[in-house]
UniProtKB/Swiss-Prot annotation:
<comment type="similarity">
    <text>Belongs to the peptidase M35 family.</text>
</comment>
<feature type="signal peptide">
    <location>
        <begin position="1"/>
        <end position="19"/>
    </location>
</feature>
<protein>
    <recommendedName>
        <fullName>Neutral protease 2 homolog PABG_02362</fullName>
        <ecNumber>3.4.24.39</ecNumber>
    </recommendedName>
</protein>
<dbReference type="Pfam" id="PF02102">
    <property type="entry name" value="Peptidase_M35"/>
</dbReference>
<keyword id="KW-0964">Secreted</keyword>
<keyword id="KW-0865">Zymogen</keyword>
<keyword id="KW-0862">Zinc</keyword>
<keyword id="KW-0479">Metal-binding</keyword>
<dbReference type="InterPro" id="IPR024079">
    <property type="entry name" value="MetalloPept_cat_dom_sf"/>
</dbReference>
<dbReference type="GO" id="GO:0046872">
    <property type="term" value="F:metal ion binding"/>
</dbReference>
<feature type="disulfide bond">
    <location>
        <begin position="188"/>
        <end position="259"/>
    </location>
</feature>
<keyword id="KW-0378">Hydrolase</keyword>
<feature type="disulfide bond">
    <location>
        <begin position="266"/>
        <end position="284"/>
    </location>
</feature>
<keyword id="KW-1015">Disulfide bond</keyword>
<comment type="function">
    <text>Secreted metalloproteinase that allows assimilation of proteinaceous substrates. Shows high activities on basic nuclear substrates such as histone and protamine.</text>
</comment>
<dbReference type="InterPro" id="IPR001384">
    <property type="entry name" value="Peptidase_M35"/>
</dbReference>
<dbReference type="GO" id="GO:0006508">
    <property type="term" value="P:proteolysis"/>
</dbReference>
Length: 358
C-alpha cells in the first residue's frame, strides 16, 4: 500500500549531493568539449576515476550525480556475464539555478580531478566473480558564475574488469540495505501535506494528458523520443498511464511517498529523491519553498513534474523503472529512442511541455 508520509530526518549517515538537471542551452552538446574518464581498481570493489578535460575550453562541472558526489548515486554501469547488475542506490532531482559552490568543480583544459568510490555499496555483487565497469553520458556544466546550469559535456570511460570477492561485497551492500530500513513512518500534515496532495492530483491529470498526447503521436514524440511508431507511442503512453493511476491513489498503490525526508538525504540543492529498490519517494524542503505547483515556462521545474519524474523511477509503478541517463532539454533530445524511453527527465519534460504549451 502506498502511503503519503512525512517524518523529521532520521539517518544512519548523512548524504550531501545528488542528481543533476540541465537547463536549455543554445549550443548542441555534441559540440562541447569531451571529458575522458579513466577507471582503475584501488582495492577490491573500490574504484578510482580520473576525469580529464580533453577540450580547449574551461569547464565548470556539476558533481551531483557524477564523480565527486558523496552520495550513493550511480557513477558506473556494472556488467556480469554481459548483463547489467541492477542499481540499488538513490536517484534524485535537484534545482538548476542557485546551486552552491561546493557541488561545482572547475577544470581548465588538460586538468583533471579524482574520485574514489565503492561500487559494492550501490549494487549487489554478492555472487562475486568477474565484472566489467564502464560509464558514458552527459554531465551538466554551469555558467561562469557557477550558480546556474547552462550546458552539457559528453564523457566516456574505459572498460575496467575486476574480480569481486562476493562475501566482502555483500557486507558493503548490506550497509545500504540497513540505511533504507531504519525510518519510522508517519502521515503528511499541515501545508506540506496539502501541497503534496495537490501536486499528486495534478500529476495524475497531467500524466493522463501526456498519455493521450503520446498515443496521438506527432512532432512532440519525435522531439523527445525520436520515434513515432505504434510500439514507441504505446510504451510512452503506458508509462504515463501507470503514473496517473499511482499518483491519483493517495491511500493505496505500490509506492510510499514522504512529504518530509526520512533519511537526512536532502540538501539545499535537492528537490526530491527516489530509492528504487524500496519504491520509496520523498520530497525535500525546497520542493515546497522554491518551486510552484506548476511552471508555465518551457522546460521549467515544478512540484508536479518533479513528482512525475520520481514516479517513473519506481519499478512498482511501471517496470522497468527509468534511469537518470540525461537531465534537461538539451541533453535529453540527444538521446536515442532506447535511452529516451528509459530516462526519467525525458518523461518529465515531455509532460511539462504540455502544461507550458511549448
Amino acid at each position: 500500500m502506498r502511503r503519503v508520509s512525512g517524518i523529521l530526518a532520521v539517518a544512519a549517515f548523512t548524504i550531501s549531493a545528488f542528481a543533476g538537471v540541465i537547463q536549455p542551452v543554445a549550443k548542441d552538446a555534441r559540440d562541447s568539449a569531451e571529458l575522458d574518464v579513466k577507471l582503475t581498481q584501488v582495492d577490491g570493489t573500490v574504484i578510482k576515476a580520473v576525469v580529464t578535460n580533453n577540450g580547449d575550453k574551461d569547464l565548470n562541472i556539476l558533481n551531483l550525480n557524477f564523480f565527486r558526489d558523496t552520495a550513493p548515486v550511480k557513477k558506473v554501469s556494472i556488467y556480469s556475464q554481459g548483463v547489467e547488475v541492477p542499481f540499488g542506490g538513490i536517484r534524485v532531482r535537484h534545482k538548476t539555478s542557485g546551486l552552491s559552490s561546493d557541488v561545482i568543480t572547475y577544470l581548465a583544459p588538460g586538468e583533471s580531478f579524482e574520485d574514489e568510490f565503492d561500487v559494492a555499496i550501490t549494487s549487489d555483487l554478492s555472487q562475486g566473480g568477474p565484472v566489467v565497469l564502464q560509464t558514458q553520458g552527459y554531465v551538466p556544466t554551469t555558467d561562469t558564475g557557477g550558480k546556474t546550469l547552462s550546458g552539457v559535456v559528453r564523457y566516456k570511460s574505459n572498460k575496467l574488469e575486476i574480480d569481486v570477492d562476493g562475501t566482502t561485497a555483500a557486507k558493503s551492500f548490506a550497509a545500504m540495505n540497513q540505511f533504507v530500513k531504519i525510518a519510522k513512518l508517519s502521515s503528511c500534515e499541515g501545508s506540506q501535506g496539502d501541497d503534496t496532495r495537490r501536486a499528486l492530483r495534478d500529476c495524475a491529470s497531467l500524466s493522463t494528458l501526456a498519455a493521450a498526447q503520446a498515443w496521438a503521436g506527432g512532432p512532440k514524440m519525435l522531439e523527445y523520443f525520436k520515434a513515432n511508431d505504434d510500439a514507441t507511442r504505446k510504451l510512452v503512453a503506458d508509462r504515463f498511464t501507470a503514473v496517473a493511476l499511482e499518483s491519483s491513489n493517495l491511500t493505496g498503490g505500490s509506492t510510499t511517498y514522504y512529504c518530509r525526508d526520512p533519511y537526512n538525504i536532502c540538501t539545499n540543492n535537492i528537490i526530491a529523491y527516489t530509492i528504487p529498490a524500496e519504491n520509496l519517494i520523498s520530497n525535500c524542503p525546497i520542493y515546497y519553498t522554491e518551486f510552484d505547483n506548476v511552471n508555465r515556462k518551457c522546460h521549467g521545474q515544478d512540484r508536479v513534474t518533479t513528482s512525475l519524474h520520481e514516479f517513473t523511477h519506481a519499478s512498482s509503478v511501471f517496470s522497468p523503472g527509468t534511469k537518470d541517463i540525461a537531465y534537461g532539454y538539451n541533453a535529453c533530445i540527444l538521446l536515442s529512442t532506447r535511452d529516451a524511453l528509459n530516462n526519467a527527465d525525458t518523461f518529465a519534460l515531455f509532460a511539462q511541455s504540455i502544461n507550458a504549451g511549448c
